[in-house]
Curated annotation (Swiss-Prot):
Complex formation: Homotrimer. Heterotrimer; with other ASIC proteins producing functional channels.
Cytoplasmic-facing ranges: 1-68, 460-539
CC terms in the record's Gene Ontology section: plasma membrane
InterPro entries associated with the record: ENaC, ENaC_CS
Disulfide bond entries: C118-C202, C180-C187, C296-C375, C318-C371, C322-C369, C331-C353, C333-C345
Keyword Translocase in record: no
Keywords: Cell membrane, Disulfide bond, Glycoprotein, Ion channel, Ion transport, Membrane, Sodium, Sodium channel, Sodium transport, Transmembrane, Transmembrane helix, Transport
Molecular-function annotations in GO: ligand-gated sodium channel activity
Membrane-spanning segments: 69-89, 439-459
Gene3D superfamilies reported in the protein's UniProt record: Acid-sensing ion channels like domains, YojJ-like
UniProt topological domain (Extracellular) ranges: 90-438
Protein name: Acid-sensing ion channel 4
Organism: Rattus norvegicus
Length: 539
């Protein structure tokens, strides 16, 4: 009895596909529309890229010695560029800066600085009462006494007032000042204001920033010239050494701006009796860089409540504020020269607590009182010279004039002359030596020299990477699932790989391997157009 193979074959018309797609992997064989075109391969991208040498190294063409040399040249140039780029980046991250000096044109008028002076001796011996000596014993080293002699036991005195003691026993400028002239005009002690420092009662000339005196010419005779008597006979005798014991004789002087409080124990210079000291000044305007190039304090951060009592931020004001906070925290009081309205420390706390607290504070960048330099600063450069006074003739004259002997004149009198060298200010400004624009320019030059690339070339490479990555993701997301044969016996769609794994149609008498399955992969409908491809198969 004859055996038949019953199969149903369905064909559909479709445009011819490229030959390379005929061996596809797991594409649908039934009604599946062809997906979007695959992205360019590396060879195609290399042949169209603007990166020099990439087309010859990775483009289409035979592989040989020439291509190998181009690959080596490309890799060498790329390595050289990366090395230079790393060096440029390291140089930029060091934040180098330079200092530019710009001497300004002479001005007709220049504001004269503030001049603060202090006698090195804090307390006049003749002005100390028995109570003062008793309370200041630890500071001065003098033994307490009464009218009957030194008798420490059983003495009772009222509580001391440190402000009153300093004001009353300090050297009075009216007694020390023998002559005063400013720009050829007479001045007096009334032109000085009282200020308290670590040296006690001191005096500042031209202290008011709202009415600072002008200097209309440079050179000697156009500034401040004063003659002082330091009153060495009022210096305290030394019975024993203390932290406050001083062996010097003379005055301390600081030249500063009106907005800056005096910090004379560290920033002042000494003037000796028996000499005329000339101080030639030059105004300097300094501009520093903030982070990341420097460590200056920017103007936007100046308005802080910690600097109450000062019109502007300065290193001196910051230091005084920090010292005050430290003394307040440890001693529960403040020293006379510190700003604020808190309780003044009594003399015994000065030596037992306050002085030790100040000595423990560091002044460097690691200390608790680190104060950054303001980004805009005015200071006065100084050149100091001196000559000995008096000569023999003037010694006799001064002795008669002030009713003193010549020895006293030589040991106590001094002359201080402060003036502008010229009415010009010197501007010094920190500038970034290597900024971002310079870095980008150097990187662009190195990139063009070694690999012939630009920013647009980098965008081309990123665009190609995006195109390839996006195509891979879409393939993963849209991978078709293999449908199963329906229970109704309808037509099922089989993938090509699954079709190869399927057993042939049921055989009704043919020899094994003689089924129609061998015919199907390249089967064309006898009446169909020559471009038709196999699509549907049912068995």
């Amino acid at each position: 009895m004859p055996i038949e193979i019953v199969c149903k074959i369905k064909f559909a018309e479709e445009d011819a596909k490229p030959k390379e797609k005929e061996a596809g992997d797991e594409q649908s064989l039934l009604g599946a529309a062809q997906g979007p075109a695959a992205p360019r391969d590396l060879a195609t991208f290399a042949s169209t890229s603007t990166l020099h040498g990439l087309g010859r190294a990775c483009g289409p063409g035979p592989h040989g010695l020439r291509r190998t040399l181009w690959v080596l040249a490309l890799l060498t140039s790329l390595a050289a560029f990366l090395y230079q780029a790393a060096s440029l980046a390291r140089g930029y991250l060091t934040r180098p800066h330079l200092v530019a000096m710009d001497p300004a044109a002479p001005a007709p008028v220049a504001g004269f600085p503030a001049v603060t002076l202090c006698n090195i001796n804090r307390f006049r011996h003749s002005a100390l009462s028995d109570a003062d000596i008793f309370h200041l014993a630890n500071l001065t080293g003098l033994p307490p006494k009464d009218r009957d002699g030194h008798r420490a036991a059983g003495l009772r005195y009222p509580e001391p007032d440190m402000v009153d003691i300093l004001n009353r026993t300090g050297h009075q400028l009216a007694d020390m000042l023998k002559s005063c002239n400013f720009s050829g005009h007479h001045c007096s002690a009334s032109n000085f204001s009282v200020v308290y420092t670590r040296y006690g009662k001191c005096y500042t000339f031209n202290a008011d920033p709202q009415s600072s005196l002008p200097s209309r010419a440079g050179g000697m005779g156009s500034g401040l010239e004063i003659m002082l008597d330091i009153q060495q006979e009022e210096y305290l005798p030394i019975w024993r050494e203390t932290n406050e014991t001083s062996f010097e004789a003379g005055i301390r002087v600081q030249i500063h701006s009106q907005e800056e409080p005096p910090y004379i124990h560290q920033l002042g210079f000494g003037v000796s009796p028996g000499f005329q000291t000339f101080v030639s000044c030059q105004k300097q305007r300094l501009t520093y860089l903030p982070q990341p190039w420097g460590n200056c304090r920017a103007e936007s951060k100046l308005r802080e409540p910690e600097l109450q009592g000062y019109s502007a931020y300065s290193v001196s004001a910051c230091r005084l504020r920090c010292e005050k906070e430290a003394v307040l925290q440890r001693c529960h009081c403040r020293m006379v020269h510190m700003p604020g309205n808190e309780t003044i420390c009594p003399p015994n706390i000065y030596i037992e607590c306050a002085d030790h607290t100040l000595d423990s504070l560091g002044g460097g960048s690691e200390g608790p009182c680190f104060c950054p330099t303001p980004c805009n600063l005015t200071r006065y450069g100084k050149e100091i010279s001196m000559v000995k006074i008096p000569n023999r003739g003037s010694a006799r004259y001064l002795a008669r004039k002030y009713n003193r002997n010549e020895t006293y004149i030589r040991e106590n009198f001094l002359v201080l002359d402060v003036f502008f060298e010229a009415l010009t200010s010197e501007a010094m400004e920190q500038r970034a030596a290597y900024g971002l624009s310079a870095l980008l320019g150097d990187l662009g030059g190195q990139m063009g020299l070694f690999i012939g690339a630009s920013i647009l070339t980098l965008l081309e490479i990123l665009d190609y990477i995006y195109e390839v990555s996006w195509d891979r993701l879409k393939r993963v997301w849209r991978r078709p699932k293999t449908p199963l044969r329906t229970s109704t016996g309808g037509i099922s769609t089989l993938g090509l790989q699954e079709l190869k794994e399927q057993s042939p149609c049921p055989n009704r008498g043919r020899a094994e391997g003689g089924g129609a399955s061998n015919l199907l992969p390249n089967h064309h409908h006898p009446h169909g157009p020559p471009g038709s491809l196999f699509e549907d198969f049912a068995c």
